[in-house]
Amino acid sequence: MSFISYISFKGIKMNVISDLELQQIRTQMLTFAQLQVNQADLAEDLVQEAFLSAFKNLANFKRQSAFKTWIFAILKNKIIDYLRQKGRFVLESELEDENTNNSFFDEKGHWKPEYHPSELQGEEETVYSDEFWLIFETCLNCLPAKQAKIFMMREFLELSSEEICQETHLTSSNLHTTLYRARLQLQNCLSKKL
């Protein structure tokens, strides 16, 4: 039974999402989960748990936000629960050294001239387009693993700086440096691809 059929079966009218859109959301959720847990099978399990939870709680979906926003919030909570259960967010052994593969900066931490970011230009609606999010995902995947995970913890999982520092054993200064570099690299990548 498809998700749309299931919704119809439950008597919930939701004609704003098709099976194709649902598959696209699922793919995005899987990518998001894989960035956090770094294991394809585990990411798949978390996405399935998020969908199962959504199925069980469809009657509680008040449509105050988009379906995608709602189900991503469920996934974020599942990931946070898993990571807290495991007692870690990022294992040092899973991370690349911050200086490894970081070709955007010189040894003093300054931008290399060829990679210095330009200002993002363009229409506001670019941020909301599917193309933007595909490019963003590509740029995010180009970040070193440590930067990508910490960026996702802060911006997508919305964890506080204190919580991230506690879980990753980073100092506040190192955290802010890592986030700053991640944002700059994302800005550089996006400015070249948009």
Swiss-Prot record:
Single GO term (MF): DNA binding
Record's keyword annotation contains Coiled coil: no
GO BP term, example: regulation of DNA-templated transcription
Keyword Transcription regulation included in the entry's annotation: yes
Portion annotated as DNA-binding: 161-180
Motif Polymerase core binding, chain ranges: 45-58
Highest taxon above the source species: Bacteria
UniProt entry keywords in alphabetical sequence: DNA-binding, Sigma factor, Transcription, Transcription regulation
Protein family per UniProt: Belongs to the sigma-70 factor family. ECF subfamily.
NCBIfam families, alphabetized: PRK12530.1, Sig70_famx1, sigma70-ECF
Protein's name according to its UniProt entry: Probable RNA polymerase sigma factor HI_1459
Organism: Haemophilus influenzae (strain ATCC 51907 / DSM 11121 / KW20 / Rd)
Taxonomic placement: Bacteria, Pseudomonadati, Pseudomonadota, Gammaproteobacteria, Pasteurellales
